[in-house]
Every structure is written in C-alpha cells, then in structure tokens.
Design a protein with these regions (language model features):
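FIC/Doc superfamily catalytic core
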Residues: 1-172
C-alpha cells in the first residue's frame, strides 16, 4: 500500500517517462526543446565500414548485404535532404531518429536490419557528441533494444509519432 512519501517519490522519478506515455496515448507527443544542430555528416562509406566491422558478419554470408544496390545510400542521403533551402531534418536528434526509423522500416538488408540500424544510430549520435552526457550513455542498452523494436512493430502511419518518441529519449 502506498502510504509514504518514499513510495510516491519512486513514481516521481519516472515522471518524464509517464508523461511521454500519456502524450503518446493522446497522440500529442511533441519534439523536445533544445535540439542540437548537426555538426557531422554521416556517409554511406562509413556505414559500410561499420557494418563490415560488426562481428555478426563473420558467421553469416548474408548479414549486412543490401537487398538492392543503393538502398542504404538512399536512406543516408534522405536524412540530409532539403526543401527551399531548409533541411528537412535540421537537428542531430531529428536526423538520428529518422535514420533509425528508415533503416528499421525500409528493411534494406537481407539480414541484420535492426542490429545495423541501432549501430548506425549510436555511431551517428557519438560522432555528433550526443551519445554521452556527463560520461553516461544517454540511451541504455535496454532502451536501445526497446526503441528499435518499437519502430519495427509500429505502423507506417505512426512514423511522425515514433520519430518524436525517439527524439524525446535523446533529450533526457
């Protein structure tokens, strides 16, 4: 039975998460404030190097193999697209969340899409000096798994909401 301030304070420790869940339920998730302009541009070649370095590739001939030539390059290029001189995704958080979403949902590889998507996502965050705050990872291993699976299981019409959810994870 909840009968003291200590019990209530435990719940208060998760107030941001509970508020995000409530906003999701009501379909009113917003982009977090204080987003960072990107300083580092990811390349297709870097992504291929990263994939080649992953240990999963040693035990599989299909891990990281693109289903069609240029699929991953198209995804990487898409997060840097602009319209009327304005970036479609102007912040690191928007680029990172969309990069993760597109690789997971577009499924450009025969095998390893979620692992590759998560790896490129954290690599991109790290290159933009956003993966660690005060020496601590901003996304725990379990959170990385959860958001990657959340995106994988989401419906296409939920894209904008899912991207905003990921962006909120990055702002905490």
């Amino acid at each position: 039975m909840l009968n003291n301030k200590k019990d209530f304070s435990i719940i208060q420790e998760y107030s941001k998460a509970l508020e995000l869940l409530d906003n999701y339920d009501h379909q009113v998730v917003i982009k977090p404030e204080g987003l960072k302009k990107d300083t580092y541009q990811l390349t297709y070649e870097e992504c291929r190097e990263l994939i080649a370095s992953m240990s999963f590739g040693a035990s599989s001939t299909i891990f990281g193999r693109e289903k069609s030539e240029g699929a991953l390059k198209g995804i990487v290029d898409s997060v840097y697209q602009s319209a009327f001189g304005e970036d479609a995704y102007p912040t690191v958080e928007e680029k990172a969340a969309n990069l993760l979403y597109f690789i997971v949902k577009d499924h450009p590889f025969i095998d390893g899409c979620k692992r590759i998507a998560a790896s490129i996502f954290i690599y991109f965050l790290n290159q933009n000096n956003l993966l660690f705050r005060n020496g601590e990872k901003i996304i725990s291993d379990s959170s990385l798994v959860a958001i990657t699976l959340l995106l994988a299981e989401s419906k296409p019409e939920e894209k904008e909401m899912m991207v905003k959810v990921v962006m909120n994870f990055l702002g905490w």
